Amino acid sequence: MNLAFLRALRRDRFFQLLIIVGMALSLFVPFAPRAWPGAIDWHTIITLSGLMLLTKGVELSGYFDVLGRKMTRRFHTEWQLAMFLVLAAAALSTFLTNDVALFIVVPLTITLKKLCAIPVNRLIIFEALAVNAGSLLTPVGNPQNILLWGRSGLTFAEFSGQMAPLAVMMMLTLLLLCWFCFPGRALQYHTGTRSPQWQPRLVWSCLALYVVFLTALELRQELWGLVLVAAGFIVLARRVIVSVDWTLLLVFMAMFIDVHLLTQLPALQGVFNQVGALSHLGLWLTAIGLSQVISNVPSTILLLNYVPASTLLAWAVNIGGFGLLPGSLANLIALRMANDRRIWWRFHFYSLPMLAWAALVGYGLLQLMP
């Protein structure tokens, strides 16, 4: 096994925490390791694998350097740049899903740091918040909405219409925060930066492979799509494959197994059976709170076994993506790409107040809806 991979695992405190939690939970449920692979959402793992390969391919091609240089010519202040990146992340997430949007915007943000002095960690935090806010608008913005849309019987427009008030409220809140958190001071460019060298052939190949991979996802042939993408990089640029942060996949696998073990706890089985009898406020708080612990996608899957795919449930699990790091898998993706331990704590300074505000105002808006 690659020594760099082992060193990365040894440094990964979050992965180690997940392993410890899993070991502790195993003491209170039947020990059945053979069932653990079935607890993993392999569609998510395969999709992430393909996206990480494609994004790393574009990054190593040098195209983000070219795009970043063009962007810095258009924006003159931190506030302008932050507003653009936040709006771009939110807009992309409405139709490309929140994780895909992050795989585009975050590497670009990291590249911009080479060209000018920017608060890169703060920008990445706001981009993570932006994709959570933007993706909740449409049925295809995130995995939980895809599940809810399939169960609701609503059209694309009807589902988007029921989510629009919450999406507008969250985006206005986020843009207002941008106004206060990013000053209007001029961007300070680094001197002596050379003109970027990039590889057009690799960029166009990544674009072609991206189309192939998306088509495979649409046809529910994600494994074959991943095989084609990996084969393409073996031929074009093998360094892409070894440069990907594969430990992220182990983190996701550990999360899925921990969630599975948690739901098997005998003490929780009776609690879940009472979910259908909860009041509107009780279900609201349960969906948000559960999302903080096991993430909003598993929470949606779990709660749909007991309650219908209502507007209340859709709003609650999407709001649950804010707050603590596990609330949304998009949070984990964004912060991992930042590759800076300090960002893990700073994220919560913004995300927890957003959760409290969204839970309070969101429930108030829900009461005003017919």
Set out the residue ranges of the language-model regions:
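N-terminal membrane topogenic signal
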Residues: 1-19, 77-78, 197-205
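Long, contiguous bundles of hydrophobic transmembrane helices that form the permeation core
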Residues: 2-4, 172-231
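Interfacial loop-to-helix junctions that mark the boundaries of transmembrane helices
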Residues: 6-14, 34-44, 154-166, 195-199, ...
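Transmembrane helical segments that form the transport core of multi-pass membrane transport proteins
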Residues: 39, 56, 61, 68-70, ...
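Membrane-interfacial loop-to-helix junctions in multi-pass transporters
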Residues: 42-44, 73-84, 115-123, 200-204, ...
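Short helix-coil transition sites and intra-membrane helix breaks within transmembrane domains
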Residues: 56-62, 92-104, 134-142, 262-264, ...
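Hydrophobic transmembrane alpha-helices that form the pore/transport pathway of multi-pass ion
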Residues: 85-87, 91-136, 301-315, 343-344
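C-terminal transmembrane helix pair
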Residues: 160-171, 175, 285-370
